[in-house]
Regions:
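Hydrolase active-site cap/lid region
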Residues: 171-224
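Membrane-embedded segments
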Residues: 68-146, 150
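Short beta-strand/loop motif that positions the catalytic acidic residue
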Residues: 224-230, 234-237, 241
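Catalytic histidine neighborhood in serine/cysteine hydrolases
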Residues: 250-271
Length: 286
């Protein structure tokens, strides 16, 4: 006659099954984060009809082809129609925005001598391909080279005029770009310290090491300082930012005292763009 298993054995089996289930669940979470991390970082979308009239009348598309597909950036020349802008601002958006969103943020820009090059991530807007750090570097460099050719200028002509501005992930791209060029000014809005440390805030420190690639703003700022000690950097960060905490912006400013830091009271991650609009524009022209 079959005898039921003693209670301690049944309990042990239950514990083992529970541990196996927890382990499998954890492995599933790890696999999900590892294989889906790109879609967690980048949120590409095309331009919808509402953007049809956004590019100013004097603006133009800058198209170029890279190994990963056709790319399209946007150039807004200086309003004085001079061939050489006093400053060329290269703008990079957040991971949920598009390059042409800068046209709203920069509305009413007072300096008619400045020009803007608005660059989308690969797979965003009118761009093909796949967004990675390497692909974005290639795309932004190619956009600048194509613009220089269109204007009949050399890199030496543009170098003393280059500035960058970026928001959120775009601030890391702006700093990364500045670390590879002789930039005069950088505006970083809502920056993280490193993408890995930002990921740790969301998924925890151990899981953040699953990140395949990570922008490192500390490293970029260090390189900017080496490349051009006279470069000016400003950080604008909302004190109510729940996406990238303001402590990260403050930490960068503490580590690099030459950075000008502006805390925007009560502003959240996106609201900082409108609430600090006038201060940002003023600093860009100061």
């Amino acid at each position: 006659m079959h005898q039921p298993a003693p209670r301690p054995i049944r309990l042990t089996r239950a514990v083992v099954c529970a541990l196996v289930a927890i382990g499998l669940g954890f492995l599933g979470l790890v696999a999900l984060i590892y294989f889906k991390q790109h879609s967690m970082i980048y949120h590409p979308r095309p331009y919808d009809p509402s953007y049809a009239q956004v590019l100013p009348a004097n603006g133009e598309e800058i198209s170029y082809t890279l190994p990963f597909g056709k790319q399209t950036a946007f150039y807004i020349p200086a309003r004085d129609n001079g061939r050489l802008p006093a400053r060329l601002w290269i703008a990079f958006c957040g991971n949920g925005s598009l390059a042409l969103d800068w046209t709203t943020i920069l509305a009413g820009y007072p300096n008619s001598d400045d020009a803007f090059l608005l660059v989308d991530y690969p797979s965003y807007g009118k761009c093909q391909g796949y967004a990675t750090i390497a692909n974005m570097r290639a795309s932004s460099d190619a956009a600048l080279d194509m613009l220089a050719k269109r204007l009949g200028l050399s890199g030496e002509d543009l170098d003393p005029r280059l500035c960058t501005i970026g928001h959120s992930l775009g601030s890391a791209v702006a700093l990364d770009f500045a670390a590879r060029h002789r930039i005069q000014r950088v505006v970083a809005i809502s920056p993280f310290t490193t993408l890995r440390e930002e990921a740790a805030c969301i998924i925890g420190g151990p899981l953040s090491h699953l990140l395949i690639e990570s922008y490192d703003n500390r490293s970029s700022i260090t390189e900017i300082r080496k490349r051009n000690p006279e470069a000016k950097i400003a950080i604008f960060h909302g004190t109510d930012d729940k996406v990238i905490p303001v402590r990260m912006g403050r930490e960068l400013a503490r580590e690099f005292p030459f950075i000008e830091f502006f805390a925007v009271d009560g502003a959240n991650h996106v609201g900082v763009l409108s609430e600090a609009h006038d201060k940002i524009i003023h600093w860009m022209n100061n």
